Amino acid sequence: KTGAENVVGVLWIHGGGYIAGMKEMVHASRAVDLVKKFGAVVVSPGYRLAVQRPYPAAAEDCYSALIYMKNHVRELGIRRDQIMVGGESAGGGLCAAVCLMARDRASVNIAFQMPLYPMLNDRDAESSRDNHGQVWNTRKNHIAWMLYLRGTPKGHVPAYAAPARAQDVSGLPPAYTFVGDGEPFYVETLHYIEALKSAGIPA
């Protein structure tokens, strides 16, 4: 760093289907590339997992980390206007949730979002229905959403819990993502990007 508030700040959220994972996973994530290529400062929150605490614990923990970054730009050496959010799998879903929360609460003007193969939809889409992948599949997906949303009334799942339910994505930051065509999250990722583009957001 050459001075205070001079590099990109990245809130990077680990994956694990909302039920597993740890903040140290950041060391094997795409966030490492952002550090190497751009000298970014990365904050990786250790959010509460759904096995212990269901929604909204994880989303609020990650949002709190975002607010921490905003309030500590000088100590972190990051630019207030260059805070981005990213994550993989459930971390990608939480990335989208945090972007919605920041917009609605008018708290942080997030510069960019990078939800990679994000877990966005608690309802089966074409790619998550009858998926028999080894790492993640329909059965694991159902269990994870059941644990994450327990206590949330059926039919009243908020967009902060499952961002695919968001009716309005206007005002969200530009986005970059990727997803494999055999992954359970393939269709919901495409739908999210299509929704952003329809709202005039570069994605």
Predicted regions and their residues:
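Alpha/beta-hydrolase superfamily serine-hydrolase fold, recognizing
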Residues: T2-A203
